[in-house]
Regions:
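A long, amphipathic alpha-helix that forms part
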Residues: 1-20, 30-32, 36-79
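Alpha-helical packing segments of well-folded alpha/beta enzyme cores
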Residues: 3-7, 129, 220, 224-228
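Beta-strand elements within well-structured catalytic alpha/beta cores of enzymes
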Residues: 4-7, 20-29, 103-106, 129-134, ...
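Short, glycine/acidic-rich hinge or "gate" loops at secondary-structure transitions
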Residues: 15-23, 144-151
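Generic beta-strand/beta-sheet core signal
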Residues: 23-26, 34, 91, 107, ...
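Active-site-proximal N-terminal segment of extracellular/periplasmic enzymes that hydrolyze or transfer
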Residues: 38, 211-219
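C-terminal cap/loop subdomain of S1 sulfatases and analogous C-terminal strand-loop tails that border
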Residues: 69-100, 112-122, 126-203, 220, ...
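Intrinsically disordered, low-complexity polar regions and short flexible loop motifs
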Residues: 206
C-alpha cells in the first residue's frame, strides 16, 4: 500500500495523474488459513523456525497485541473468512465466487467514458490486462521472443468496457487452484472440489452459487466439462 501511495504522489507531482491508466484489484477473497497444526497450515514452517529460535508467534486475533509485525500471524479461520465474503460463497484457495471474484477499481480521468463512481458488473480477468494494455498502448503482441515463437495470448481487451460499452463475452474462463476447478462461460459456471461431481450455477440469476442446476441441465454440464477436458485432460 505504501508503494501505491508513493507512485500516485509521483504521478501527481509530474502532472501525469489524469492520463495514467490505473487499475487496482486483489487476487482472491478473504483468507481462511491458520498458522497451526490443524486444518490448512501452509505457513507451519514459520512456527518451526520460530520454535527453533526460542521465539513465540502471536497467532489469530489478539486484542492486546498489534498485529502485522514479523512475529504475528493474523487469521480469522474458515467461518469468518466465509462471512467476510458475504454474499459470495467460500474464500481464498477456492474457485467459488468468494475466492475468485474480486472488485477492480479503475482510475483514468482522461480516458474513461463511464460516469465517475459508477459500477460495471461486466466480467473481466487478470489475464485480460495483456490485451487491454496492448490496445491502449497501440502495441502489437510479439510473434517471437529470443529466437523462439511465442504462443498466442488468451486475453480479451477490457477497453470497450472502459469506454462504457456492454460487451457480450462468451469466452470460457478456466480455473484450477488448490484442488478446486471451474469453468465460467457466458452466464453459467461449473465448479467442483477435488474429484467430486460438477455443480452448475446460472450466475446471471444466482451469483452466490446456491442453486445447483446440474441435474436439471446435464447437457450444459457435459458441454462445459468438455472445455475442461480439452484444456486439462480427463484425468485432471
Amino acid at each position: 500500500d505504501q508503494a501505491v501511495g508513493t507512485l500516485l504522489e509521483a504521478l501527481k507531482k509530474t502532472k501525469r495523474m489524469e492520463n495514467t491508466f490505473i487499475i487496482y484489484f486483489h487476487d482472491n477473497g478473504a483468507c481462511p488459513e491458520h498458522l497451526s497444526g490443524n486444518g490448512w497450515n501452509t505457513a507451519n514452517n514459520i512456527l518451526a523456525k520460530a520454535e527453533k529460535a526460542g521465539k513465540t508467534i502471536a497467532v489469530g486475533d489478539k486484542y492486546d497485541i498489534p498485529m502485522g509485525g514479523p512475529m504475528t500471524y493474523g487469521s480469522v479461520g474458515h467461518n469468518w473468512a466465509n462471512a467476510q465474503n458475504t454474499p459470495m460463497r467460500r474464500y481464498k484457495s477456492n474457485v467459488h465466487n468468494g475466492g475468485a471474484c474480486t472488485p477492480a477499481i479503475v482510475h483514468w480521468p482522461a480516458g474513461l467514458k463511464t460516469k465517475p463512481g459508477s459500477i460495471s458488473k461486466q466480467r473481466g480477468h487478470v489475464v485480460d490486462l495483456m490485451a487491454t494494455c496492448l490496445e491502449l498502448a497501440g502495441a502489437k503482441y510479439p510473434e517471437e521472443f529470443k529466437g523462439g515463437e511465442t504462443k498466442p495470448h488468451e486475453s480479451l481487451s477490457l477497453v470497450p468496457i472502459l469506454k462504457g460499452k456492454t460487451v457480450d463475452r462468451d469466452h470460457a474462463y478456466v480455473f484450477n487452484h488448490s484442488g478446486t476447478h471451474a469453468i465460467v462461460k457466458g452466464e453459467y459456471k461449473i465448479v467442483r472440489e477435488g474429484r467430486g461431481p460438477w455443480a452448475l450455477y446460472h450466475l446471471a440469476k444466482d451469483r452466490t452459487e446456491t442453486k445447483n442446476l446440474a441435474k436439471q441441465d446435464p447437457e450444459r454440464v457435459t458441454e462445459m466439462v468438455s472445455i475442461w477436458e480439452k484444456r486439462w485432460g480427463k484425468k485432471k
